[in-house]
């Protein structure tokens, strides 16, 4: 049985740990709220861009070939953009994303497709290097408030790769923010773009300058950039949410362990007192018999 001194030392250690995890929980909660606001702030622009894309592609029939809309009959090259945090302590979030990435890569390789990986985030980068995947580009240290320009290198790489024939399909894997308790690993196809087609009765007769084909060609890359940026923002919100929940669970576990250690301390202390009283009583009885 450990001594009371050892138990007291463990109680102090657990108490300090609970204070740290509680502070991390509060920081993550604040960051999560800001990340949620960032996600919501970009949605109106993304939704409006999607509407314009649907209206344009509904009119520009036969313009898919040679653009980011082209669906190729034979797929050979596939690019996977994996979005993960730079840091850990986020529960099972990172493991779930990387497990989904491994399964996707294996499935594509079984189809005889060449898979190239682009990593956004240190955790994903390290995993791809460790498992000897074909990592061709990486972006790390984005922070909690990334800008669209921070990921332009990745989006430009896949756009040029698609137009040049290096990639026939491009996917992004990220953790979708559902709510505070649920973050879902999600794979979305970025290229070729499959925008919604507006019904004829909903179309408005706009005038495009210089032409609707030129406008569409300019919008297609912007659409890919916004979709990737949206995925990164979702992943950041998911990261802080998962870390907040993980730190809350760690705090609760530390408090429960502290209660158990306190109970053990009291029992050990009571046993020591009982032993001392018994020894004193035995000594007094022995003296009385002399």
UniProtKB/Swiss-Prot annotation:
It is a peripheral membrane protein. It is found in: Cell membrane. PROSITE patterns: ATPASE_GAMMA. GO terms for biological process: proton motive force-driven plasma membrane ATP synthesis. Keywords: ATP synthesis, Cell membrane, CF(1), Hydrogen ion transport, Ion transport, Membrane, Transport. GO terms for molecular function: ATP binding; proton-transporting ATP synthase activity, rotational mechanism. InterPro entries: ATP_synth_F1_ATPase_gsu, ATP_synth_F1_gsu, ATP_synth_F1_gsu_CS. Pfam families: ATP-synt. Transmembrane segments: none annotated. One of its GO terms (cellular component) is proton-transporting ATP synthase complex. HAMAP family: ATP_synth_gamma_bact. Produces ATP from ADP in the presence of a proton gradient across the membrane. The gamma chain is believed to be important in regulating ATPase activity and the flow of protons through the CF(0) complex. F-type ATPases have 2 components, CF(1) - the catalytic core - and CF(0) - the membrane proton channel. CF(1) has five subunits: alpha(3), beta(3), gamma(1), delta(1), epsilon(1). CF(0) has three main subunits: a, b and c. Belongs to the ATPase gamma chain family. This is ATP synthase gamma chain. It comes from Roseiflexus sp. (strain RS-1). The gene is atpG.
């Amino acid at each position: 049985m450990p001594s009371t001194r050892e138990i007291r030392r463990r109680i102090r250690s657990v108490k300090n740990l609970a204070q740290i995890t509680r502070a991390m929980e509060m920081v993550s909660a604040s960051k999560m709220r800001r990340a949620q606001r960032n996600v919501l702030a970009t949605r109106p622009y993304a939704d409006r861009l999607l509407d314009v894309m649907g209206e344009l592609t509904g009119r520009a029939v036969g313009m898919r070939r040679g653009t980011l809309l082209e669906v190729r009959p034979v797929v050979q090259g596939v690019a996977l953009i994996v979005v993960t945090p730079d840091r850990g302590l986020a529960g099972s979030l990172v493991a779930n994303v990387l497990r989904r990435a491994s399964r996707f890569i294996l499935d594509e390789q079984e189809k005889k497709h060449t898979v190239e990986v682009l990593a956004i985030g240190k955790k994903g980068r390290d995993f791809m290097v460790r498992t000897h995947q074909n990592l061709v580009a990486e972006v790390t240290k984005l922070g909690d408030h990334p800008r669209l320009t921070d990921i332009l290198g990745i989006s430009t790489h896949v756009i040029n790769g698609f137009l040049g024939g290096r990639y026939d399909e491009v996917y992004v894997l990220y953790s979708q923010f559902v709510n505070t308790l649920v973050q879902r690993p999600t794979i979305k196809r970025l290229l070729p773009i499959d925008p919604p087609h507006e019904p004829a009765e909903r179309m408005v007769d706009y005038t495009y300058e210089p032409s609707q084909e030129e406008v569409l060609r300019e919008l297609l890359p912007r659409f890919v950039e916004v979709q990737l940026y949206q995925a990164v923002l979702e992943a950041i919100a998911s990261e802080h949410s998962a870390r907040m929940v993980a730190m809350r669970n760690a705090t609760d576990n530390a408090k429960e362990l502290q209660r158990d250690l306190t109970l053990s301390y009291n029992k050990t202390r009571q046993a020591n007192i009982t032993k001392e009283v018994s020894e004193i009583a035995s000594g007094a009885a022995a003296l009385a018999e002399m």
